[in-house]
Design a protein with these regions (language model features):
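Flexible "cap/lid" loop of the alpha/beta hydrolase fold
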Residues: 88, 92-94, 98-139, 164-165, ...
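Conserved loop-alpha-helix segment in the C-terminal half of the alpha/beta-hydrolase fold
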Residues: 187-221, 225-228, 233, 240-241
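Active-site nucleophile elbow and catalytic-triad environment of alpha/beta-hydrolase enzymes
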Residues: 155-175
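Active-site loop/oxyanion-hole signature of alpha/beta-hydrolase fold enzymes
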Residues: 36-72, 88-89, 113-117
Length: 248
């Protein structure tokens, strides 16, 4: 049995992991999906005081309160920032860190600094114009979703706290590198806003020593929300990675 903690990306909530969580539990694993402050069923808490540190604490507290060790921490999209921070602060509690089409920051980077200037300026302008200092979700079609999946995600998405977008993340890459890491690269279609990250983790020219060189890359032929568009394939991948973690 493996212990999974699943963390959603921007505009989502624990709801997006529903099918994966159910499948992991049926397979005999323990699975806990986190909803970050200000989004999902916690959208009523959205406000300008939510920071990157708030969300890092959300994940750490979930691990602590569930009394989990040997955690397979799967982080989606924006939550790559959070997974990196958790690996830095409590590497001994993690068995594997799985970046699901996620941000893989360098020390001192913010999430916004991995984006093109037009994307960055648009989101920051939207946040500045919002009383809650947040920016709205995109149409789910950008995640490669169609039909019922598209409509479900469109109904469920909520604005994302803007200060989490701007804040740089300081961490020790040597400490994070103690944790086995895998990047799941979703390729059909690839999300343009993580092109920088995709290149960073798949092209050895951009590796920063052991920090990225020690990472494994797995491809899934689905869009940016694989927990929705390909839940069984993602579940199988996570179970395989948990098996690897058990033998390291």
């Amino acid at each position: 049995m493996a212990n999974f903690v699943l963390v959603h990306g921007a505009w989502h909530g624990a709801w997006c992991w529903r099918h994966v969580t159910e499948s992991l539990i049926r397979a005999g694993h323990r699975a806990h999906a986190v909803t970050l402050t200000g989004v999902g069923e916690r959208a009523h808490l959205l406000g300008p005081l939510i920071t990157l540190e708030t969300h890092i604490t959300d994940v750490i507290q979930a691990i602590e309160s569930e009394e989990m060790t040997e955690v397979v921490l799967a982080v989606h999209s924006y939550a790559g920032m959070l997974g990196t921070a958790v690996a830095d602060r409590m590497p001994g509690r993690l068995a594997h860190l799985v970046y699901v089409d996620a941000v893989v920051p360098r020390p001192g980077e913010s999430w916004s600094s991995t984006h093109a200037s037009a994307t960055r300026e648009s989101r920051l302008a939207a946040a500045a114009a919002s009383p809650s200092y947040s920016f709205p979700p995109p149409d789910p079609s950008v995640f490669g979703l169609e039909g019922a999946d598209h409509e479900w995600v469109k109904r469920r998405q909520t604005p994302h706290p803007g200060h989490t977008y701007e804040a740089p993340l300081d961490f020790d890459p040597v400490r994070v590198a103690q944790v086995p890491r895998t990047f799941i690269n979703c390729t059909r279609p690839p999300l343009a806003t993580i092109d920088v990250i995709r290149t960073r983790v798949t092209d050895p020219k951009f590796w920063d020593g052991a920090w990225l060189a020690g990472s494994r890359v797995v491809e899934l032929a689905t869009g940016h929300d694989p927990m929705i568009s390909a839940p069984q394939a993602l579940t199988q991948c996570l179970c395989e990675l948990a098996g690897l973690a058990a033998h390291t």
